[in-house]
Each structure stands twice: as structure tokens, then as C-alpha cells.
Amino acid sequence: MPCGEDWLSHPLGIVQGFFAQNGVNPDWEKKVIEYFKEKLKENNAPKWVPSLNEVPLHYLKPNSFVKFRCMVQDMFDPEFYMGVYETVNRNTKARVLHFGKYRDVAECGPQQEVDLNSPRTTTLERQTFYCVPVPGESMWVKEAYVNANQARVSPSTSYTPSRHKRSYEDDEDMDLQPNKQKDQHMGARQAGNVGGLQWCGEPKRLETEASSGQQLSSLNLSSPFDLNFPLPGEKGPACLVKVYEDWDCFKVNDVLELYGILSVDPVLSILNNDERDASSLLDPMECTDMAEEQRVHSPPASLVPRIHVVLAQKLQHINPLLPACLNKEESKTCKFVSGFMSELSPVRAELLGFLTHALLGDSLAAEYLILHLISTVYTRRDVLPLGKFTVNLSGCPRNSTFTEHLYRIIQHLVPASFRLQMTIENMNHLKFIPHKDYTANRLVSGLLQLPSNTSLVIDETLLEQGQLDTPGVHNVTALSNLITWQKVDYDFSYHQMEFPCNINVFITSEGRSLLPADCQIHLQPQLMPPNMEEYMNSLLSAVLPSVLNKFRIYLTLLRFLDYSISDEITKAVEDDFVEMRKNDPQSITADDLHQLLIVARFLSLSAGQTTLSRERWLRAKQLESLRRARLQQQKCVNGNEL
């Protein structure tokens, strides 16, 4: 473990040291960032930092150094705070300078008060992000991060599990002890909000007594607080993230790894409750709007903790088996990549066999599933996203659990995924598109607010006859736009705003999908197990964990490989296409050439080759020929139904 735990348990003390040395000179801020950056470079240091993803909030010490793996769900308006402020001792008149960065509550002793008129006060700006755990993150990803984390934590003395669980009992106690409740609110009145920093005259007393007020505050909310997770059933903490530097580098839906100082000060809840009380004196309509915005933007810290960011990085991926940044020229990263690439061929062969079994013995469908799983939008030409490869697996058995168990297999392979059961009920009632709530001044999430490289599996086999209402039609349109243009149009009431995305869409259906797809492959099962669940479970249990991890590394790593086509091969492909057009002018089109080039690209990358070879081009033609022949055969059997 890194020597000296102060930077983990008392980071504000470290910051205070730099501030004391440099005073109002802004260099102290750069030195703080550099200090923590160097600390995290020490051997295995990041593993010793407690993570909000893995450690319950009540086990984390307030104002300790933590990390959080998250997606930016919303960005609030910038806020002003007191970067530097001065306190005056009421008895001795002694003046002390304090820093306000990385704090929600201003520090002042029992006999001190903030001098609001001090010429040395500095007002600065910070940005607030609303961040949620990565939507659809696979269980194996969570488990790997938990196993890697070596942070030693125990229940915090100021925020214990028993106190958290007794919230309703605390509320009853408050009713029975009105004098105690009155005293607490008297204490709260000594607090105030100045320049984005809460300040108080008796911080010790408020901190210890505020827990009951905090629970009362959360119980008094007009409705249960919605953590605004994009996907149903998601768990984990949402956080208000205060960003001080380079916030323009980040955007909504980015996946970030944050290192910063945890703020769960109970005083925040009392102060926010008081602000709601004060707003009730205003016009009723204005009061309602302000109260709703206040409720959303300043929720109880016990529900939505604050993180004051010291360091933040955008994550290329969330696969814990790979180095975080794959395009760095670090020797460690290069060694890992080159080592894995040297054994790529047997990994691909094993993965192909594994997916062939999962697809009931269909090796051609398994080939296309591999190509789909490593596909990614690598660039955009005008509005056209290049590299997307949506696959429609038709011929899936109806009234079977096959599609459900196939999704479970995919879940075990990719870092993040979601299965959308395409029923009339779901299409008509689920919220797909994020929309702006102007009353609360926040972006309300929808199912399609997903980070890059999420696998979205759409199961059409559950679709029955029925009527789509207007929201249902809008949802189908949203899915079509996502597949075709890799974008989601967020609803801002008065206008729509395009949010580009990079989502891998895989559609399972009985006949041809209602949705557009880049490629349709018709399933030809070679076996039909009498017990699908037992068959799929035995398939998963037969794979060694080490082999499964190789599959996971393979599918993530190949997305980031560069790819090119030499002039020589380009000429050969053009000549070949001209020859194909001569032989079959009716059915070979420019779209077919584009499809062949996409298949050839991902076929090459799946073999670890970053340039197209003649051999891979011929193999791509062979695969496409087999796929088209199978579709034609199915068309002959079922008429126009594919």
C-alpha cells in the first residue's frame, strides 16, 4: 500500500498544506492536482482508493478521497462559489484565510464568522454534473472491479448503517420530541449559503445532530426521489459531481473515472430544507417551480452524495481485464496488447466454437455474431456513421427461451448490455427518448441514453398482434434512427437535439425484423435441446473462467485496432466488383460492395489483421454468398417471409 494514508483519509489536509504555503497565489491549485496525480502513479495506488461503485456509502468517511466509475447523465448550470474567503474571530478579531475549493460547507470555528465584505474574498466558477453508474454494466465487470479493489474501509463513525436503517424510527422520535426538533432547526438557522458554499457557526454540533433532520428532509420530499437511471432495475449511487477544471472536455453520456473528495455533510440537507421553506413565501406557481428544481438539484446527501473532482479521465472502455487507455504508447500497454495478439488465432477459434454451440450448432451465424460484437463506429462521413453493423438474427424459435438465454451468453462476453423485450406493452409505455423537464431544469433519462459500445439486444420474438399508439410509433422511429444513423434525438419540447451514439444493436426475430438492419442472417439450428436453460447453463459452466476472460479481452480489444486498405488491394477489390457486376448485373449493387467491405473489415480485425488481404476478401465474399443463399432458400420455402 502507498506509504502515508493521509491523502486517502484526509485529502483536505493535504490541500490545506498547499494553500497555506502559497496563499492566494493560484499555483497551489496546480500543485494539488499534480500531487494526487503522482500519488496515483505509485504501485497499485488506484486499487487502494475506495470506490463508490463497490463500497456502500455508509462505509465511506466524509471528506475522504474516493473514486467513481460513472456516466454523465446530465449537466447542470455552472455555479459560483467562494474560492477564497476570510473568517473573523468574534473575540480576538483575528483573521484567517480559507480555501473554498473541494468543499460544500465553509470551515469556520465556534467563535468565527465569514467576513462577506472582505476584499480578499475570491469568487470562482465550477460545473456540476449529475452522474449515474454505467447503465447496463455486466455483473462480471462489477465483480472484477470489486475483486481488484484493495481499499480497507469500515463503517463511518458519522454515518453508520444502523442510523441509515432507522430513518422512519427517527421520524417517529421527532414527533415525540418536538423540543429536540425545534433545537435542531434553531441550529440550522445559524447556517447560511454564501457564494455556493454553505457556512455555519457551530459545525460540530450541526454535523452530529443533523442526521435526524436529514432523514426528515428526505421524508418530506413531495415524491420519492427519482435517481434518473436510464435503465429499469439499475442499482448503485448517483452523485452530484463538482468539476473545477476542463469541464468543456466532457459531454453528456461520456463514461468517466473520477477521483475526488467525498462530501456527505448532513448540514446540506437542513440548509436545502430551509431554502424550500423560504421559497414558500413567493408566488405559488413560482414557488412550485423553484421547489422542484431545488429538490432535483440539491437532493439529500445521504441519497445523492457530492464528489469534488480532483482528477477525471474519460474512459475508452470499462473492461477491467484491459489497460484503461489502449492508445497510449506506454510499454506496459504495448506489451499487454502485443502479448495477447500473438495468441489471437486460438482464442478466435475457441470463441467461434463457443458461439456456434450457443446458436444451436449454426457456425455461419456464429461468424456474423463475432463480426457484430467487434463492430464500432470508427468515423462519420457527413451524417453517415461508418463501421456500424446491426445484425438481425431471424429464424429464432418462437415461444422458446432461446433468445433470453442467448442474451445471457452475450452478457457474459460484453462489458455493458441491455435486452429490450419488444412487446406492444413495452413499446407503448416505456420511455425511450430522454426529455428536458423545464420545471425541474433537468434531463429526464430514457432507455436510449446509453454510453458508447453498449450492446442493445432487441427481442422481437415476443411481439404479438396489437395497436401501437403515438408514443409506441415514436419509440419505433427512435429505434430506427438509432440503427440507421447512430443518433438519438433528445426531446427539448421546443426543439429536438441530436446526440450521436455508438450502440451495437443485435435483433432477434422469427421472420425478418420490422426494424432496419445492416445484415440479416437466418438461423439454421443443427439441434434443438429439449431443455434450453439446462443446455445454455452447461455450455457456460463448461468454459474455463480464464478462457471466458480471453473472449472478453478479444471482443473489447479488437474494437480499438486501426485498419487500412492498401492501394494494391483497393485496385483488386474494384476489379473484382466490376467482374461480379458483369456476371450478375441484376442483383449486385453498390450497397453490396459496401456490405462486403464492412464484412471484410471486421473479418480481418477478428483475425488480428489491420490491413485487408486477398485471402480475407475472398473469405468475406464466401460468407456473404452463403448468407444470401440461405436467405434465398428461406424465401423459396416461406414465400416473401424471410
From Swiss-Prot:
It comes from the Eukaryota. GO terms for molecular function: chromatin binding. Pfam families: MCM_bind (PF09739). Residues 151-188 are annotated as: Disordered. The modification Phosphoserine is found at residues 154, 167, 298. Its main location: nucleus. One of its GO terms (biological process) is sister chromatid cohesion. The modification Phosphothreonine is found at residue 160. Keywords: Cell cycle, Cell division, DNA replication, Mitosis, Nucleus, Phosphoprotein. It is found in: Nucleus. The keyword Cell division applies. Residues 151-161 have a biased composition (Polar residues). One of its GO terms (cellular component) is nucleus. InterPro entries: MCM_complex-bd. Belongs to the MCMBP family. Interacts with the MCM complex: associates with the MCM3-7 complex which lacks MCM2, while it does not interact with the MCM complex when MCM2 is present (MCM2-7 complex). Interacts with the RPA complex, when composed of all RPA1, RPA2 and RPA3 components, but not with RPA1 or RPA2 alone. This is Mini-chromosome maintenance complex-binding protein. It comes from Bos taurus.
